[in-house]
A protein has these predicted regions:
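Divalent metal-binding segments
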Residues: 2-185, 190, 197-265, 285, ...
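Carbohydrate-interacting/catalytic domains
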Residues: 9, 444-445
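His/Asp/Glu-enriched, well-ordered alpha-helical/loop segment
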Residues: 247-257, 261-286, 291, 296-303, ...
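Nucleotide phosphate-binding/pyrophosphate-handling subdomain across enzymes
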Residues: 308
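Short, Lys/Arg- and Gly-enriched loop/turn segments at beta-strand edges
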Residues: 419-426
Length: 445
């Protein structure tokens, strides 16, 4: 910024948790043209037109990034969630389309933006929109929803930055190699990639353990072991088709997010990604979605491969007893190995999968801390980074968002209390007072 230019906005008199490379804490932050222009040393940037906000002891952190949140579905269901209204393991149980036309799609996306802003969420990943769901029961995951996102982005009406994964099969259901290849040829809407970006593809490898549909080396109580959801008459053909999907998408440079919960499906997915990376180089930031039964052996491979883990501690806490009922207590004891993942250096993103759960990152972090049996400020930092820094990396956007440093966007979440000073169990009681997107207020309590 030129020396003669003053800031548009200065926040001072509180704590700024930058989550930058040095994990610095500051007392002030200056913003101009939607980006951070100074941290701490802001006095010389205050001019007659600068808005100066006295934080009065409040805390600023980077805007929250819920890296697995079904926005249109959330907006259509809100204030209800699957857990508040009964759990069906997917979108089952809906009497009719939740969004039946363009007006309903727009209203749902805008409502999700309102809900996100009130929680300090400035970015989220919409994990699965596309032709695979064009005849879907809810209407919340269709190609038309992606088109509506693009229209809102180009009109400047989105209240969060959105990353999209395209879906060429059925949500929580089967997919075919032919449909996958056909879908990849479809055009992607043209938008500002810092507002709306289609990053890659979503694949459902299997189901979930409580529904006995995750593909596992274990046996469920009914004697079955699940299977892959990708098309094929036998396991070998299904594995080959899944591997082919991953190889095709990888060679295109697409990011690949794979819903994989069973240990057996996770092994197949990671092996396929590893082979694609070895043959073609690291072309996309791929990741496992959920990863309930990931083994220690596979977990140890992920950092070297650059493969991330996107998991939902709230779901782990809520469905643990159901997993035990399906597979036994011994399997539950090694499920969702969050602490091991962090310790090994796996790129871990925490998320909510809203509206499966409510989209409250504070509750998700509290659930993660309880699951991992950790507490204290360093543990809180680690968990907060899994909702800010690491999701920006997953988005391929760490150079311009996810932490507070000069040149990065001024996406800010202002809290009434410093989260590093509270016990994880008390984090849900910490209030969000203001949310800024690109230096503009999108929520104020």
């Amino acid at each position: 910024m030129a020396a003669s230019r003053t800031a548009d906005l200065v926040l001072t008199g509180g704590t700024v948790l930058t989550f930058d490379a040095e994990d610095r804490e500051a007392r002030a932050l200056a913003v101009a043209d939607g980006t951070v222009v100074a941290v701490d040393d802001v006095d010389g940037l205050i001019g007659p037109d600068t808005e100066v906000v006295d934080l009065a002891g409040r805390t600023v952190l980077p805007g929250i990034n819920d890296s697995h949140l079904h926005g249109a579905w959330l907006g259509a269901m809100w204030p209800h969630t699957l857990f508040s209204g009964g759990f069906g393991g997917g979108e089952e149980g809906t009497a009719g389309p939740l969004v039946a036309d363009a007006a309903a799609r727009r209203a749902a996306i805008l409502k999700a933006g309102d809900v996100a802003a009130a929680l300090g969420i400035t970015s989220y990943t919409e994990p699965g929109l596309g032709p695979g769901e064009d005849e879907g029961q809810t209407g919340c995951f269709t190609s038309a929803v992606l088109d509506e996102y693009a229209a809102l982005a180009n009109e400047g009406l989105l209240r969060a930055r959105v990353t999209v994964l395209r879906l060429f099969g059925i949500l929580d259901g089967p997919s075919s190699l032919a449909d996958f290849q056909r879908g990849l040829a479809d055009d992607i809407p043209s938008t500002d990639p810092r507002v709306l970006k289609v990053n890659g593809v979503k694949i459902f490898a299997d189901g979930i353990p409580p529904m006995r549909s995750a593909w596992t080396h274990h046996c469920y109580t009914d004697g079955t072991s699940g299977h892959l959801l990708v098309d094929g008459e036998q396991d070998e053909e299904r594995v080959a088709n899944l591997r082919r999907m991953i190889d095709i998408a990888h060679r295109r440079g697409d990011q690949i997010g794979v819903h994989a919960t069973g240990d057996r499906s996770i092994e197949v997915v990671v092996n396929a990604m590893a082979d694609a990376i070895a043959e073609h180089g690291p072309l996309g930031r791929h990741y496992l979605i959920h990863g309930d039964l990931v083994s220690g052996e596979v977990l140890r491979r992920l950092p070297g491969l650059g493969i991330g883990l996107n998991t939902q501690p709230g779901i782990a806490a809520a469905t643990g007893p159901w997993l035990a009922a399906a597979l036994g207590d011994d399997v539950l004891r090694t499920a969702w190995p969050l602490r091991d993942a962090f310790d090994l250096g796996v790129p871990v993103c925490l998320s909510t999968d809203a509206p499966v759960m409510e989209p409250d990152w504070r509750r998700a972090i509290a659930a993660a801390a309880q699951w991992m049996d950790v507490s204290g400020p360093e543990a809180m930092r680690q968990l907060l980074r899994a909702y800010t820094v690491t999701p920006a990396y997953q988005d391929g956007a760490e150079s311009w968002k996810g932490s507070l440093a000069v040149g990065k966007v001024a996406d800010l979440c202002v809290l009434d209390t410093n989260p590093l000073t509270v016990a994880p169990a008390d984090l849900p009681g910490v209030g969000v007072t203001t949310t800024y997107l690109g230096g503009k207020v999108v929520f104020q309590s």
